[in-house]
Amino acid sequence: MSESLVVCDVAEDLVEKLRKFRFRKETNNAAIIMKIDKDKRLVVLDEELEGISPDELKDELPERQPRFIVYSYKYQHDDGRVSYPLCFIFSSPVGCKPEQQMMYAGSKNKLVQTAELTKVFEIRNTEDLTEEWLREKLGFFH
């Protein structure tokens, strides 16, 4: 089984984009959506979005194809503080082709390590990506 697990590399320009994204100064929500180029076996940029809420973000995700998302979220704490956690979200909808799911699942950890992220979440249905869901997930870290 392990020999069929494909681990894709991360495109060089995407590595640089993720590094810059980590240190961005803007105070709005933003997302980098990534996909796998299966011929090149590379994780590549799909879209970059600024000023996007979790609910708007879910509308950008394909319902039948996996995607990786790095999301900078303006998190308002109960005590009034504001932070901007970087979240990694693996969208792996039910109904994806099994080989596609395997390729994404096999490449997820490498991408998380490359992007140096600790807040890693997974959704199986794009409808699950809501502000409430994200706040609940982030609540475990704060």
From Swiss-Prot:
Pfam families on file: Cofilin_ADF (PF00241)
Protein name, entry field: Glia maturation factor beta
Xref: Gene3D superfamilies: Severin
Any one GO cellular component localisation term in the record: cortical actin cytoskeleton
Keywords annotated in UniProt: Acetylation, Growth factor, Phosphoprotein
Span of domain ADF-H: 4-139
A molecular-function term among this protein's GO annotations: Arp2/3 complex binding
UniProt keyword Phosphoprotein present: yes
Post-translational modification: Phosphorylated; stimulated by phorbol ester.
Organism field: Homo sapiens
Family assignment from sequence similarity: Belongs to the actin-binding proteins ADF family. GMF subfamily.
